[in-house]
Amino acid sequence: MTILHSTDFFKAGISTVAIEPRLPQSAFPEHHHDFHEIVIVEQGSGIHVFNGQPYTIGGGSVCFIRDHDRHLYEHTDNLCLTNVLYRAPDAFRFLAGVSQLLPQEQEGNYPSHWRVNQTVLQQVRHIVAQIEAVGSDTDTHAVASREILFMQLLVLLRKSSLAEEATNNDARLNQLLAWLEDHFAQEICWEEVAAQFSLSLRTLHRQLKQQTGLTPQRYLNRVRLMKARHLLRHSDESVTDIAYRCGFGDSNHFSTLFRREFDWSPRDIRQGRDAILQ
């Protein structure tokens, strides 16, 4: 597995914050690093496999990666990221208590993926631009300025995360996408789901297309297929059982969609043939 080292990203040993844009981010194999990062998805879509679990990400997704987490990107489509790197929550020179603003692991569950709306994303871009404008100077004022801006970024992300009440269409769409991650196997009526989150069907189609590049049904199919691929790799259930468990009513249709998405059949994945060639 690839290991990324802080010495390659932080311009000097004294630096505590760094910005690494990926415009775009292509598919990247599984890796981990000896630093922490906040991944901000600017636009496009892709699959983020985090500690073995697949997540569909798009514009407004925010991912919190710790130094012991492993992750990879695949099936990227114009996926543009900004990576905000920091050495560790307790490694700042002028900040204390940073960990209180980060996701907290409870009973083995680490809420690594948040979403913010497009208005907040613009504010995030502004703060990131300010951090970049400070440059890589290592004098006291530059280090302090970068850390202050990093704290502003954390506060903004925390206040704007899904814990906040949905007050506009962007926030409602983000909550709908989070809901789909947990209810993907259900039979979905898009009119009912849109109404559940106080969206018109037309608004749902338009905003989801803008944020992910996919129609609602295409997005749902991708989520279902990613969950199915994970089960094929990590369970002993039959292909048919996995198809039904992931919301597909017909195993033949499931196999057709699966091959179209991944260029491998479910049986190929079960036998690990894709891993052999990677």
Swiss-Prot record:
Signal peptide: none
Pfam families per record: AraC_binding, HTH_18
Site keyed Interaction with sigma-70: positions: D241, D250
Gene3D superfamilies, A to Z: Homeodomain-like, Jelly Rolls
Domain HTH araC/xylS-type: 174-272
Gene Ontology cellular component terms for the protein in this record: cytoplasm
Annotated localization: Cytoplasm
Top-level taxon: Bacteria
SUPFAM superfamilies per record: Homeodomain-like, Regulatory protein AraC
SMART domains named in the record: HTH_ARAC
DNA-binding region: 191-212, 239-262
Keywords: Activator, Cytoplasm, DNA-binding, Repeat, Rhamnose metabolism, Transcription, Transcription regulation
HAMAP family: HTH_type_RhaS
The protein's role, per its UniProt record: Activates expression of the rhaBAD and rhaT operons.
Quaternary state and interactors: Binds DNA as a dimer.
Protein name, UniProt field: HTH-type transcriptional activator RhaS
